[in-house]
Amino acid sequence: MDASFDVVVLGVGSMGSAACYHLAKRGMSVLGLEQSSIVHEFGSHYGQSRIIRKAYFEHPDYVPLLKRSYELWNVLEQETGTRLYTETGLLYAGRKDSMLMKGVRESAGIHDIPIEFFDFDRLKKVYPPFSLHPGHDIIFESGAGFLEPERCIEAHVEQAKISGAQIRSHEKVLGWAKSGSGYEVTTNKGIYAAEKLVLTAGAWIGGLLPQVSQQLKVTRQTVFWMATKHPDLFSPERFPCWLAETENSGDVYYGFPNLQAGVYGPLHGLKIAQHNPGQVTDADSVDRMVSAEEKDAMRAVMEEIFPGEYAGLLHTKVCLYTYSPDEHFIIDVSKDDPNLIFAAGFSGHGFKFCSVVGEVLADLAQDGKSSLPVQFLSANRFL
């Protein structure tokens, strides 16, 4: 046995880095194992920016977790002196009776979240590049914006190390097994003992927890960065994040302001992607080439929402979503083993929560329960 720990965290990405941070801050001995580099482009967290919002159309039960998440991101910014969150506001647009727009109104009403209703004259005055369907509702949430995911993960990892955690990258977990009251974890570099395990392996969790993998599907998602003819109109100081249904297909797309390379990571341009599930795939064999057809389709979306602004394609990336059957998270303790904790199935809307999910996972590892309202995310829905 190479070393023993109170907790070993398998997967140090979005959720795992936050779990290591919270566990180590509580004085527990922690080992975080990551098969790739700490920040990498193979999973779900890469890509410069992630929207964070409170008028949560997916379900109002998420809003208390979001409020806590905002608090924790602010704490992490203060601890590190690093910018992690930029407030730009968020524009929602879609049919009045769509899940998107009904959900925004419901969460805002239940949880008293400030939102504004825009008409088209107001939209064109405040954000002139937009051209949205005249029959669609438009809602603006001022207290929304975006996180920088790579910086967030690096901040969690560095603060976890300061609190005593050991974080090991490029170390692949080959398997784990019960050993007495705890566990034995085998990697390509060693064998470790743990009293408790936290599994946060994202799209790779199926190989570590087969009973959960049966409830999950991994999808291939494409992301695009476009050049615009008037980039100043799209700067973070003048332009919001957005979620919008298209007129032609009714699919939901999302995007960000024009982010400058060097200021916001290595990429630049107007980032746009589709929020709907992509093609089902495998994390290890996903096609990471973006086809000409996919590029043409996204250009058409760009020209529908921002007519006359397309000035070329700058970058493309492929990332992974891991969907649960109902597209809500799975966060729980194994019903067969109180020392096995897992988080999975974040379904393309999880990153904004990783600060609070890390806190919940630390609660579950330390006490077997959390005071935060996560019962609706229990694995009992499926298992």
Where are the language model's segments positioned?
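Beta1/beta-strand and adjacent pyrophosphate-binding region of the FAD-binding site
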Residues: 2-13
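Active-site substrate-recognition segment that forms the wall
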Residues: 21-25, 81-85, 191-192, 196, ...
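Flavin (FAD/FMN) cofactor-binding core of flavoprotein oxidoreductases
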Residues: 121-125, 146, 280, 292-355, ...
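Helical element adjacent to the flavin cofactor pocket in flavoenzyme catalytic cores
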Residues: 141-196, 200
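Short beta-strand to alpha-helix junction loop
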Residues: 64, 92-100, 140-159, 287-294
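Glycine-rich FAD pyrophosphate-binding loop
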Residues: 24-45
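Dinucleotide-binding Rossmann-like beta1-alpha1 core, especially the glycine-rich loop
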Residues: 49-126, 135, 253
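N-terminal Rossmann-fold NAD(P) dinucleotide-binding loop
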Residues: 16-17
